[in-house]
């Protein structure tokens, strides 16, 4: 069976367990990467920490990173509890998810293709690694980018983005597929904006490295 990386956004984490377990029960090796965007923003606002994004990445100070880490840990525990005894919770910075720091954004990193031993051992044991997207440093890492980096590093066959939208929309219609070059062009001219942007960029990177990437119902092909 194939190796699959599933990225679950913070808004849909609690509703993702059934889809994850269905793939695992079918014999696929499943690695999960989760976000926690809404939870992090809520906590940052509670502590009076400014919430700012640049190109889909969260500007992160030392105080912000503490909130990011605690929020990721809480979401990770909740998702593992929902998945049951096969789930193994992992924090990316503790297992060797490497990233290049982007100093202009603070304690933020651009993840590099990684093949963490802890993830491989979990998969080999028939378990489901559930990874919080922190990079070695520690650095805050965009969850979409982290999922793509792991998919490439783990040589996964598929990268699935589970979101609260049906897929990539253009002119009000969900696309069944989009070619990476066309997606690049539309991103550059501003056709796409908001949360779909980092997902598309991550899917493009994965597709160009041999991974079949899907955002909801939309396949992104190299």
Could you say what each language-model-derived stretch is?
Residues 1-222:
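C-terminal catalytic "cap/lid" subdomain
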């Amino acid at each position: 069976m194939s190796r699959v990386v599933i990225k679950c956004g913070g808004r849909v984490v609690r509703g993702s367990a059934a889809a994850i377990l269905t793939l695992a029960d079918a014999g696929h090796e499943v690695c999960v990467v989760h976000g926690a965007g809404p939870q992090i923003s809520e906590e940052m606002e509670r502590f009076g920490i400014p919430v700012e994004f640049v190109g889909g990445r969260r500007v992160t100070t030392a105080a912000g990173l503490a909130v990011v880490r605690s929020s990721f840990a809480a979401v990770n525990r909740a998702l593992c509890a929902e998945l049951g005894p096969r789930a193994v919770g992992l924090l990316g910075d503790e297992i060797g998810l490497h990233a290049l720091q982007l100093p202009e954004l603070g304690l933020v990193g651009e993840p590099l293709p990684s093949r963490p031993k802890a993830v491989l051992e979990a998969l080999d044991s028939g378990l489901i690694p559930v990874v919080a997207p922190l990079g070695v440093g520690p650095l805050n890492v965009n969850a979409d980018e982290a999922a793509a980096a792991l998919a490439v590093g783990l040589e996964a066959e598929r990268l699935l983005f589970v979101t609260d939208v049906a897929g990539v929309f253009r002119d009000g219609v969900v696309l069944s597929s989009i070619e990476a070059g066309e997606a690049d062009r539309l991103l550059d001219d501003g056709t796409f904006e908001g949360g779909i942007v980092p997902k598309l960029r991550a899917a493009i990177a994965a597709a160009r490295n041999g991974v079949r990437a899907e955002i909801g119902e939309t396949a992104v092909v190299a």
